[in-house]
């Protein structure tokens, strides 16, 4: 027995002596560390990963128990091209992987599969805005940047801070699931105001089009939107601060402190924006504070905490100018407030073997108030004039949840993802609407809604030769609509690899289902002067979605042309109705509608400094069934605010010491309504052109300027709500410390 133990000890000793420790660091083209990259370590000429790890804040991994020999490392990091290299231990024990900027088809994205993967292998339609592009654009809020992405149509009711909605592939504005740092930030049922979401310290934005409920659950009916905060990476602390101002009494200031040292990284940031606006009661202000901190617990475990808080106030003019005709004066006293707080704690564990585990817990607190305290434009219920009556709408939503995701990679061409989600949706809301209240008291009577939802999901990826397949399903237990199974399958095939000019042709197809839970008001009713009864028996709204597309690259991947056809069948859509006998109102699953169309995108690198992304979208919609509804929402009518023709253009120039961008959003005539009986049944088409630029007057001082609505055109994204005319901002940005 003693001899056996001695032999085992000798073997272990020899193993430790001849085992090599690899220290690999992942950096970008400027030698800055890349955190969060997925690194697979394999034996040379093998497809089974020995280790699958995620880089820490300093861009490094340190896999242990690797014997001397020949290996291959494969690196996937969002925003970069996929990287692969051979190395030999112990000679390459300290190895640096320098990532390159991706060609138009090589960009690595996360949202399509919930883990890093080159976009051309996802079988999905994904568009991105990277940190440099966002810096060029200097958007005030999320809607200011999204409008320049392919397939996105933005409708903002008003100007800065106005209610801004996203329409994708003919779906409703509530058919989009939005996340900030992994936290869902829409209300249950999909409501989200994009116009008050600031983008300070956002490093990356991804828009995934198509039904995506298999991976993301309720509300992901036509798109998923993901925002990712910047992480600190420089060993020396970096202090970034700046300020800008412009016409309309606009003032903006911001700052951040970030860095990474040892096991820790950090990014603490703040932002304040104020403007008086273009007309009466058109002011907007928003303050933001946040942090993104992480620590490496061990060579295989990493913990990250994210916190973000914003508080906005918006003057609401209401409807007053219809296609350039100012029929009414703007409302002088209506205003809207929104206060949002999110927190997310995420633990990533590598192993054992080819597994990666992600555990996260989050909470999102969302409060809104929209009120009008003075009837300055007229209110007389005796003649059914409710144009400018007193009202007070209050919403308080809290979403808290726990998520688990496990990624198993037995081969480089095979990956399985499993997950579990639990969410507590809790909310209080009311809608008080009266014709007179001299004391300003709107009463109480809040409605309470509560849902406890659970889900499990499974996804399988297979890539063999020219063929790629991604298939999965989600089983949902929702407290409102019960149990559902939601499938998705996406396949792509490389028709030809091509040559120097035609460098690759890929066909793709996807079938998916999407679901959307009822809003709290629809399920639990509304209090107030015009109440709605609760309906606990509402079904989930559904989308049956097909898409098929072609992708063609040119000149060794420098340019890409893609075209996709989509077909959406929406059913069980929820509509408000009234009992003709009791005159009580409530919500029912009544409507069906249809949307089909095409998306064409051309993008490329015109030169090493100039990038182009252009798109054209055609969308045809129709209401198939709307019992009891009248125009403009009757059976046979097109869906409101969905243009048949729209397009976008984005040019970005990056050089040493200076850069700039040109953005264009082109939206055709679309059906709309004033809902006041004035006869306005459409919103006119428009072309919005923005420009921006920056120049380094010193290596650490940057001068920048941005102009919105360069052509100074009148336009209305929502009929009755004129947008801003030409407006500009200019400022200075300072950087202290850092790399």
Predicted regions and their residues:
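Conserved C-terminal beta-signal and adjacent last beta-strands/turns
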Residues: 256, 295-297, 509, 638-739
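Membrane-embedded beta-barrel scaffold of Gram-negative outer-membrane proteins
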Residues: 108, 259, 263-264, 354-374, ...
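Extracytoplasmic beta-strand/coil segments of soluble accessory domains associated
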Residues: 126, 143-184, 203
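Short, acidic, small-residue-rich periplasmic hinge/interaction motif at the N-terminus
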Residues: 29-30, 40-42, 76-80, 90-135, ...
């Amino acid at each position: 027995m003693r001899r056996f133990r001695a032999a085992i000890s000798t073997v272990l000793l020899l193993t430790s002596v001849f085992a090599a420790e690899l220290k690999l660091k992942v950096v970008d083209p400027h030698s800055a560390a890349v955190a969060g990259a997925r690194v697979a370590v394999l034996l040379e000429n093998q497809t089974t990963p020995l280790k699958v790890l995620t880089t820490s804040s300093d861009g490094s991994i340190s896999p242990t128990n690797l014997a001397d020999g020949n290996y291959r490392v494969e690196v996937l990091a969002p925003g970069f091209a996929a990287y692969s290299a051979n190395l030999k231990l112990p000679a390459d024990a300290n190895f640096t992987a320098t990532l390159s900027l991706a060609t138009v088809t090589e960009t690595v994205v996360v949202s399509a599969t919930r883990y890093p993967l080159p976009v051309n292998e996802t079988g999905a339609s994904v568009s991105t805005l990277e940190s440099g592009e966002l810096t060029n654009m200097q958007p005030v809020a999320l809607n200011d940047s999204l409008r320049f992405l392919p397939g996105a149509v933005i409708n903002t009711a008003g100007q800065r801070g106005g209610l801004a909605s996203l329409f994708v592939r003919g779906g409703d504005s509530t058919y989009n699931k939005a996340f900030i740092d992994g936290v869902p930030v829409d209300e249950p049922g999909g409501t989200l105001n994009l116009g008050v979401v600031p983008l300070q310290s956002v490093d990356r934005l991804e828009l995934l089009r198509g039904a995506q409920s298999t991976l993301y659950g309720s509300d992901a009916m036509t798109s998923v939107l993901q925002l990712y905060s910047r992480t600190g990476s420089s060993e020396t602390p970096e202090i970034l601060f700046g300020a800008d101002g412009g016409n309309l009494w606009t003032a903006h200031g911001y700052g951040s402190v970030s860095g990474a040292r040892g096991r820790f990284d950090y990014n603490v940031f703040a932002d304040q924006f104020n403007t008086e606006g273009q007309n009466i009661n058109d002011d907007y202000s928003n303050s933001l504070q946040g942090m993104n901190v992480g620590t490496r617990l061990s060579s295989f475990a990493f913990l990250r905490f994210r916190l973000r808080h914003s508080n906005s106030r918006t003057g609401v003019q209401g409807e007053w100018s219809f296609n350039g005709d100012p029929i009414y004066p703007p409302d002088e006293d209506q205003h809207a407030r929104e206060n949002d707080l999110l927190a997310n704690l995420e633990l990533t564990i590598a192993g054992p073997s080819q597994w990666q585990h992600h555990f996260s817990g989050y909470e999102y607190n969302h409060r809104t108030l929209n009120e009008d305290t003075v009837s300055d434009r007229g209110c007389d219920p005796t003649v059914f004039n409710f144009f400018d009556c007193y009202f007070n709408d209050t919403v308080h939503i809290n979403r808290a949840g726990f998520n688990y995701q496990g990624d198993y990679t037995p081969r480089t061409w095979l990956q399985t993802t499993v997950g579990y989600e639990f969410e507590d949706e809790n909310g209080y809301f009311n809608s008080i609407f009266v014709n007179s209240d001299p004391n300003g008291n709107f009463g109480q009577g809040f409605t309470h809604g509560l849902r406890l939802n659970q889900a499990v999901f499974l996804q399988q990826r297979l890539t063999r030769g020219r063929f790629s397949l991604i298939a999965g399903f989600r089983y949902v237990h929702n407290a409102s609509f019960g149990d559902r199974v939601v499938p998705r399958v996406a396949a792509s095939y490389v028709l030809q690899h091509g040559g120097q000019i035609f460098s690759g042709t890929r066909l793709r197809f996807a079938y998916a289902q999407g679901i959307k839970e009822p809003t709290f008001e629809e399920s639990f009713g509304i209090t107030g002067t015009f109440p709605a009864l609760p309906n606990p028996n509402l079904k989930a709204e559904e989308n049956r979605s097909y898409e098929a597309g072609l992708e063609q690259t040119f000149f060794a991947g420098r340019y890409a042309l893609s075209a996709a056809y989509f077909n959406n069948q929406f059913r069980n859509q929820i509509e408000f109705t009234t009992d003709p006998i009791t005159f009580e109102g409530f919500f029912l699953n009544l409507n069906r509608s249809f949307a089909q169309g095409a998306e064409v995108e051309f993008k490329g690198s015109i030169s090493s400094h100039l990038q182009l992304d252009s798109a054209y979208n055609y969308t045809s919609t129709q209401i198939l069934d709307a019992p009891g509804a009248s125009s403009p929402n009757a059976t046979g009518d097109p869906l409101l605010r969905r243009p048949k023709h729209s397009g976008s253009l984005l040019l970005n120039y990056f050089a040493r010491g200076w850069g700039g961008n040109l953005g264009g959003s082109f939206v055709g005539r679309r059906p709309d309504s004033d809902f006041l009986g004035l006869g306005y049944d459409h919103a006119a088409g428009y072309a919005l052109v923005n420009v921006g630029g920056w120049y380094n007057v010193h290596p650490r001082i940057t001068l920048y300027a941005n102009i919105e609505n360069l052509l100074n055109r009148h336009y209305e994204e929502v009929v009755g709500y004129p947008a801003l005319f030409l407006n500009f901002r200019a400022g200075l940005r300072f950087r202290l410390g850092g790399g």
